[in-house]
Structures are given as structure tokens and as C-alpha cells.
Amino acid sequence: MKEGGAPIAPGAPIARRMRGAVLGRRAAWWEAPGRGGAPLVLLHGSGTDAAMLAWGEAVPALAGPRAVLAPELPGYGGTATLRRPYSVPRLGAWAAAFIRERCGGPVDLGGSSMGGAAALWVALEHPHLVRRLILVSTYGLGGAARRPRLAYAASRLPISLPVMGALAASERLTRRVLSEVYADPARISADVVARSRRAALTQARTGAFRAFVRAETGREHFRTDLSGRLRELAMPVLLVHGLRDRVIPASAARRAAEAAPRARLVLLDTGHLPAREDPAGFNAALAGFLDG
């Protein structure tokens, strides 16, 4: 049993850490085997996130009928960072290269927050690579996210790397930051705090999160807004969002579900991280979409 209390079925496929190259540079990812069919690729979010911190419950639960791959995105978990700017198009191009080089063909593609924006970009720019699309608490759907001016200012001051170092050093501060993205702070386990602190230490070294915020924030708004292109999506789309998301409001997902021609919307009683806060509900939603 892992974070959130969702049991992992006996005999569930074990995810193994893999290393290789994407676009000729160092890459790491987690992979659980499957019996065939299109693999599922899951892209994690930003900040103190990482592949198996985001998807640790989902990977073994969804693998078996299909292989599941969860890459460490550039600047996270041992993958070389992107050359600047660290923008959604640059991140999406990396994800498309991962699919081509490591999967060899079309996949079911999902992403959370920053990773959701990258997944959406891939689906729009390289639709031949995406059979089905899963958008979880996704950035880039339009509408107001919180505090663009604050993010803009912070990304341009030399403080974000020391802040990440402070998170890595302080259990109390890390728990306080996580309480902003969890609807129920009681769901923040000691293991999650410890792993988030390790992820913060990585960001203190690589600066990928700061680079992403710097690339994506203007003085008055966030730069990526793909909501006007949602009608271009020909593939089935699943949107999963937390009703109590204080980072990206659920209204953004509702509007996106109305705009995408073949969209399905699942709202869970969580904050910004439904895969962590309600793994049973989240995995059931994805399994129904993928196997239905």
C-alpha cells in the first residue's frame, strides 16, 4: 500500500527505472510491462514533483493490459534539463521525441499540470502520436490561474533556487507548501513530504522549475493558452480535475470538456493532485477510459 491508501493488487507489474537518451541527451523514466497494445505515457507536473511521486499509484494499477511509461521530465529525476526557454512548446517537443524514440509509435498520453500542457501540445502538434489523451489538472486550458504577477516577479529574482533549498531542508515548510495543492492536508503522508524534499533538492540544483515559470509567466497572465485549439482534437479526451483545486480552477476543465469534441470529464473531491489524493477514484476513471 502506498500514499493515499489505495491497495496495489498482488502480482501487479513492477515499474523499473530505465536510463537512456532522448534527443541525444540523458534521460530517465519508469516503465512497467504490459501484454501488448498501445503503451500509456504519463507526464508529471512541475516544482517538487517527479515521475513516481505523481504516478506511483497509477503505474502499477494501469499496467498489465498495456505498458506504462512515466518519464522524468527535463531537469527532474536524472533527465538532462532543457536549453532555455523551458516553455510548453519546448517541453512538448521533448515529450514527442520520447514517444518516437522510446515507444516507436502512437501512445495513450496523459499529463498532470505542466505535464498536461505538454501532453495537450503533443496532441495538437503531432496528433499521429496520440491515440487517446488524458488531461489532469492541466495548465494551459485558459482561465485565470493564481497570482501570475507574483509568479512573474519571483521567477525573475535570484530567490527561487534558495527557496527550493529551504524546502529540501525543512519538513515543516514542505508540508505547508503541499497543503496548498492538497484539498485535505491529512492526506499528506510523511513519505510524500520526504520525497517532495528530495525533489526540491533536485530543483535547487537544476533550476528547471524556475526556468519553466520564467518562460510561462507574463506580467498579467500565463503565456500558454491552448483553449482556442481544443476543437482540433480528434481523439478521445479524458479530463480529470479536483473540485477543490486552488491552483487551476475546475471551471477551466469544464470549459475544456465542452470545447473538445470527444471529451469526457471526471471531477474528484481533491485539490490539484487527484492521482495522489484519490488514487482509487483516479485509477478507476483512467481504467474506464482506457479499457472502455
Locate the predicted segments by residue.
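Active-site loop/oxyanion-hole signature of alpha/beta-hydrolase fold enzymes
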Residues: 69-110, 284
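Conserved HGGG/HGGXW glycine-rich cap/lid loop of the alpha/beta-hydrolase fold
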Residues: 31-78
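Alpha/beta-hydrolase fold catalytic core
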Residues: 1-42, 63-66, 103-105, 287, ...
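Catalytic active-site module of serine/aspartate enzymes centered on a nucleophile-bearing elbow/loop
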Residues: 262-292
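Flexible "cap/lid" loop of the alpha/beta hydrolase fold
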Residues: 124, 132-163
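Short beta-strand/loop motif that positions the catalytic acidic residue
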Residues: 233, 239-241
